[in-house]
Amino acid sequence: MTKADQIFKANIQKIINEGSLSEQARPKYKDGRTAHSKYITGAFAEYDLAKGEFPITTLRPIPIKSAIKELFWIYQDQSNSLDVLEAKYNVHYWNEWEVDQTRTIGQRYGAVVKKHDIISKILKQLAENPWNRRNVISLWDYEAFEETKGLLPCAFQIMFDVRRVGEDLYLDASLTQRSNDILVAHHINAMQYVALQMMIAKHFGWKIGKFFYFVNNLHIYDNQFDQAQELLKRQPVASQPKLVLNVPDGTNFFDIKPDDFELQNYDPVKPQLHFDLAI
């Protein structure tokens, strides 16, 4: 069993056994019912990407291609436009969070990246001093939240550090997430930011190192417990999936394309499970 599957099953079981029930929940299902959840706080995981430990489950198929396209929309296009997301990447699921018929998700995610020119600043300071301890990407912008409506960012902060091991430099990343629907989005979000880590590492010709993942509120919605039990029953495949970025070292961050990523050794358990999303 892969490390990701071990952690996934353990967290599902912990939420079922020890989780707290939500109160005054904000999300709704499509039928208008309040989407309550059972949750734990302070979930943490560590993966050594250099040793082939990738944070993706084999217990159900994870839509990695669309997840990576969403990441490009945020950090390369630096956009909040749903039209850009659909026309360029054929990704539609963010339509559920359109703000006031603006064809945007409000001043969130890519709009905040663009507002602060975050990627250019991160690349510049890593180039000037790889060992600086100030490599923080934060999407938590109170001014932007007051400017427009919109879903507040779930995965909102990632930090980078560089380590030397022998002659090689390794880029580590630490992702902080305020809230995460473990059955649907956990491995999507983790692998998105592993992809971002890989893009920055490739930009400098470094190797990928460790990936640390902290979720403040890790939950299962109250209409997902049958799926949770099904996942606990499933036997994972033995092979370890691996995400590969097929571009030469030193490729500029903004020249990398979604199709440059390849998920190898991925043969997840089927069939896919259905989830009614909470909006």
UniProtKB/Swiss-Prot annotation:
EC number: 2.1.1.45
Record-given protein name: Thymidylate synthase
GO biological process, alphabetically ordered: dTMP biosynthetic process; dTTP biosynthetic process; methylation
GO cellular component, one term: cytosol
Record-stated family: Belongs to the thymidylate synthase family. Bacterial-type ThyA subfamily.
Function field: Catalyzes the reductive methylation of 2'-deoxyuridine-5'-monophosphate (dUMP) to 2'-deoxythymidine-5'-monophosphate (dTMP) while utilizing 5,10-methylenetetrahydrofolate (mTHF) as the methyl donor and reductant in the reaction, yielding dihydrofolate (DHF) as a by-product. This enzymatic reaction provides an intracellular de novo source of dTMP, an essential precursor for DNA biosynthesis.
Binding-site positions, dUMP: R133, R134, R178, S179, N180, D181, N189, H219, I220, Y221
Native species: Streptococcus pyogenes serotype M5 (strain Manfredo)
Sequence positions that bind (6R)-5,10-methylene-5,6,7,8-tetrahydrofolate: D181, A278
Residue numbers annotated as active site: C154 (nucleophile)
Entry keywords, A to Z: Cytoplasm, Methyltransferase, Nucleotide biosynthesis, Transferase
